[in-house]
């Protein structure tokens, strides 16, 4: 792109003009020194300022010629590389070159704008030409805002001017609408521009006729002509004179009104001495004037003398306007009109004083005749014009000959002598005709050529003070001011805003001066505003002046729109060009990258080929090595395969041999198994044969024993017949012996022939009976002569009813004392006998541990008593655990169909121990039985104190946790022991009173004779409910059962794991549960232990001398004691009975001391009811609704076995 021409300034003003540096990076990074550019041979040395590199912060100036002076007239610009260049200005030929360059530039601009207009589409053209009324007035308002004084007075003056202009616009538009009803704002504006182009203001009739006569394409052609005319600036130049004259007239009107009011001058104009001289005209303005020459100067401009043109330009800058464009326009207009040129010559030579004097003389001569204010009177006829010329010449010559030459300090004469408004109007008309170049002005100039130049210059300077304001309208005429693409690298260098900058500076100075002139008359402006347009200028003149202003505004709007469109189009082209260049640059980069890539690809391909060759060579080597390795591996594999086959063959042979051996071993094992099975079969057969033989032997033994018993019975009968008297003497002793014997024997193994009622109904007699049972059965059969044989054993209840109704139930055991050993229990034993129900679970799972202590005898007994008690019991202390085990095995053979009966009741007590000689005689046995009863003090129990008292209280335990043993003591309907408590329901008795039986040998006594109790004590309120033969056994059994419960409870408290406990400690604990400790002797305690041992429910240990020291109860015994079967449902047919004395002679129903009531746990099995009693049952107190006693009204089913000692 080309470089812009540098801006030229003169004097002390320096203008910097920076050309666009190259966009290349190399030119910015490198340091280059610019060489001096020689425009003319006489140019002065240059001063170059070299910019430092980007890294340096402070640039340094370097002088090429240090001795040369810094030029006063210079041009400063920037070189392509960024260096600042200061050049000396050649005053001689710089203006002509600049003028030519400016003409060429403007010519290029016009041609480009015309080409752009022709390239636009119709829509775009219509868009540019569509100018609204608001846009027109916005131009004038913006001009007033930017270029006029900002004071309040000026602002108020602008409002009526704008209103007047708007009214003029509306009138013109209405006139156009009257001429052409289809006219709009666009067509109206185009017509105004067309009139401006033609230089005439034709009437409405001519415009209407021209529009109708032309074709449809006339509007488009008119648009093109109007736009091209606006581009050429010719119309603007033509209207500028009228606008200047209009403003000048307005200022003169204000001044005349003020003079009428005899006020000091409002505007203080500068004297000619304040203006710069012609010699001091800045050369920058002369150059700038050359830049603003229009394209339509005409052919005369090239022929004008350059020196004369320079002189006129200096004069115009000094007196007309300091703005270069206005001065240039003035010179151009002066060269076009000879009259104006003659006036300028007069002003230059004699300062224009002759012309001013001539005008003053002419005005003064016409004061008597008023000058009409209408525009028609301002037009002179030929005779009037000639007369005016004569008078002006004569007056001017007279005044110049008589008046001296005025100094520069004298005020202008036209400002002081002209007082009347009509004179002013005439002067303005004449000045207007002079500016139009009429003949009267030419003659005046010719007559004044020889006058004083200084006076003329002074007059012209005063007259032209208002001219700088006229230049304000030319700001927007230069269409190059609003377009500046200096920074763009794609600028076409069409426009130059340096002229606009200098023009703005001059405008600022002028506005400042204009504002100072109005500082003194702000208070006067308000009175003058009412008379703005009250002059004699008629409506037509105002319309013409307004038309010119509107035409200028429309022209500027069209120029702006066209320039904006051109700029947009150019910007779009620049963007496209930028995109194209960017694409080209990117393409170049891509090409470079592709070249580099191709080069790299070639290098890579070459390297790859070399690598492939190396790899191929290496691969061949590897393949050769692999082939050799494979051959070696194949040979090795072949060798291993042969070796594997050999090993497999050897292994196969070995497996075959092993299989044969295993097969042989299996056959041997099968043979052994067959032989073993044969042996087992033989052994089983032998066992069966042995069992058969044993069964036969047992049967033979039973037959033998039966025969022996029969022989004994026969012998006993024979002895009874032989000794009737002896039997009567020993009746009482034998009665006691039988009771003691039955007490120990019937608790475990009741006799089969006696209707106890406590053996289960369906229970058969055990096959393995002891010898003692047989002996006692024989004795019972011998003594029971009067008992009927019709009583049945299976359905009769127990004959211990008298004892059962006062029997002592089991006592609960306190769970808090389970974990205590016997030593702690002995130290602190509970006084009241009250134990919870759940002790059974703890005792049933307790481990057995032996706790043995060596105590010589029970505490509280003398050694003699203990020794005698043990010594007087034959056959007991010699027992050993072996015998106990033997007896236990014998007892276990007995089974019940509905469950097991507790051990203390199903065991058979043997009075004679385990080793009883079957060959003993009956008399010996009877003697032993008597001695045992005597030693155990049962012979005098009628007078002894009871063991303990039984409490009848029923409030100790809840009702739901109690139970009874059952209907009877050994009821066949219960799986366990029946309740020791009578639970039959009370009812009316239907039986006759029974007589007590006095002796067990009394066979003549009736079976219905019952004793009140075991010892024959009767009571008035006692009702016997059992025969006397059965009372003794029942009472003994109840006594034994209650004592057994006390012993078991004491043992449970001492041993929680089922181990051995010293009997002396156990006896002391038993006494702690009794209220009357003297009723339960140590001999009775030992007897209970022996009875339990014979029933295999207790184990005892003896010392070296055969005395028992320790005992232990088995777990089944503990469980059977704590768990009792439920009472069988059903009522009893027995009548209600009175409370009677029990075994220990205490009234059961009225006793309040002794043991507390305890619950009895029960389970229902078999055919018994599952209902559990819910009430707490007191000891010795039966519950209502049930009965545990035998119904004595029943007949015995086996009369043959009813003949025993119990009847």
Curated annotation (Swiss-Prot):
Coiled coil: 564-727
Gene Ontology CC annotations of this record: P-body
Biased composition (Acidic residues): 469-507
Compositional bias of kind Basic residues: 25-36, 511-523
Keywords: Coiled coil, Cytoplasm, Stress response
GO terms for biological process, alphabetical: negative regulation of translation; response to salt stress
Keyword Coiled coil part of the UniProt annotation: yes
UniProt biased composition (Polar residues): 7-16
Region annotation Disordered: where it falls in the sequence: 1-58, 248-284, 398-420, 451-535, 586-735, 1124-1148, 1163-1183
Subcellular location(s) per record: Cytoplasm
InterPro entries noted in UniProt: NST1
Sequence ranges of Low complexity compositional bias: 252-262, 1163-1176
Biased composition (Basic and acidic residues): 586-721
Disulphide-bridged cysteine pairs: none
Protein biosynthesis listed as a keyword: no
Role description: May act as a negative regulator of salt tolerance.
Similarity remark: Belongs to the NST1 family.
Name of the protein in question: Stress response protein NST1
Organism per entry: Eremothecium gossypii (strain ATCC 10895 / CBS 109.51 / FGSC 9923 / NRRL Y-1056) (Yeast)
